């Protein structure tokens, strides 16, 4: 994907926001979206021989203004939320990672914030332990993309690696984009935060623990990687299983589901190539709805597992 200088200006603020938390996303999280019905911060599902656990890293509240959905009037966005009995003045954005246990290994999909985020985030370790999963038992980490809320959980503020034992997989086109020093220097100052954060996390990372994959291939013969470009140049979905007993982690193919699953053509402010992201979103959600398989995403609340149902426009995520 080719990004113009105009693109860089458009997504520069989003790159800065996802390097940590945007300045407006600093309010404590509401309990309703942080924990499951049992109040544990995780939800577990068996899928054939595999076990999948959705684990909350927390929730951040951000005021809802016209910048959040770039191509739709704010009043229409608010009406969509109101029709679902959801608040219309703010968005409570969940951060949900997943652990897949299959063939004797534990795979963590995305990492959240660790101690790099704002209030209400960085709860992944607490909830992993509540689920009986020791962080040191994670064998492999697979990243959907390299925005800060997905990778900051690899390294604490003091530089300490959070999962020194784990092998980390990154999509080759994603690392090629963010790792390009010339591209970073050519970007406007406002767009450099995301590039700089990737270097903070990965510079000095043990080379034997960092591997690249080509989207569309299978990792360890277990986890399918599905190209879903547009949110970022190498954004990738991750999946396991087959037929209706298949689970797909959307990553950020769609942000807040009550807006962008319902309306795949809407542009969230964080999509780097909005038109491509919308095309990808529509195609992937339509395919998954037709399959009737299980779906979850990084910005989906617990229980974290649902199926997609086609509406007259867009889809519903039914848990």
Regions found by a protein language model. Name each.
Residues 1-2, 7-30:
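N-terminal export signals
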Residues 42-131, 237-254:
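Conserved beta-strand hairpin/beta-sheet module of binuclear metal-dependent hydrolase folds
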Residues 49, 100, 110, 138, ...:
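Divalent metal-coordination and catalytic microenvironments
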Residues 23-54:
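C-terminal segment of N-terminal export signals and the immediately downstream linker at the start
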Residues 57-58, 111-113, 146, 173-174, ...:
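Active-site metal-binding loops of divalent metal-dependent hydrolases
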Residues 97, 119-169:
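Active-site metal-binding motif and surrounding structural segment of the metallo-beta-lactamase
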Residues 122, 129, 133, 137, ...:
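Metallo-beta-lactamase
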């Amino acid at each position: 994907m080719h990004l113009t200088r105009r693109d860089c200006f458009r997504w520069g603020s989003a790159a800065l926001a996802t390097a940590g938390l945007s300045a407006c996303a600093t309010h404590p999280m509401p309990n309703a979206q942080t924990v499951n019905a049992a109040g544990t911060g995780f939800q577990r599902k068996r899928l054939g021989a595999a076990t999948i656990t959705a684990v909350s890293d927390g929730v951040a509240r951000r005021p809802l203004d016209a910048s959040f959905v770039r191509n739709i009037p704010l009043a229409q966005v608010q009406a969509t939320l109101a029709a679902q009995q959801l608040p219309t003045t703010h968005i409570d954005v969940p951060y949900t990672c997943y652990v897949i246990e299959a063939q004797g290994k534990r795979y963590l999909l995305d990492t959240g914030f660790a101690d790099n985020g704002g209030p209400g985030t960085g709860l992944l370790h607490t909830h992993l332990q509540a689920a009986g999963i020791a962080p040191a038992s994670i064998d492999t980490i697979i990243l959907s993309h390299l925005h800060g809320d997905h990778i900051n959980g690899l390294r604490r503020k003091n530089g300490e690696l959070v999962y020194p034992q784990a092998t980390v997989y990154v999509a080759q086109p994603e690392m090629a984009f963010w790792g390009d020093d010339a591209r970073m220097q050519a970007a406007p100052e406002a767009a450099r935060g995301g590039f700089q954060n990737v270097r903070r996390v990965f510079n000095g990372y043990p080379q034997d623990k960092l591997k690249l994959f080509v989207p569309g291939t299978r990792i360890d013969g277990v986890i399918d990687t599905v190209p879903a470009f547009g949110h970022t140049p190498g954004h990738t979905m991750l999946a396991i299983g087959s037929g209706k007993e298949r689970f797909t982690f959307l990553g950020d193919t769609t942000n807040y589901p009550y807006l962008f699953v319902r309306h795949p053509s809407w542009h969230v402010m964080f999509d780097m190539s909005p038109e491509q992201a919308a095309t990808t979103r529509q195609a992937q959600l339509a395919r998954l709805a037709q399959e009737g398989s299980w779906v979850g995403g990084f910005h989906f609340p617990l229980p974290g597992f649902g199926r997609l149902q086609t509406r007259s426009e867009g889809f519903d995520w039914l848990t």
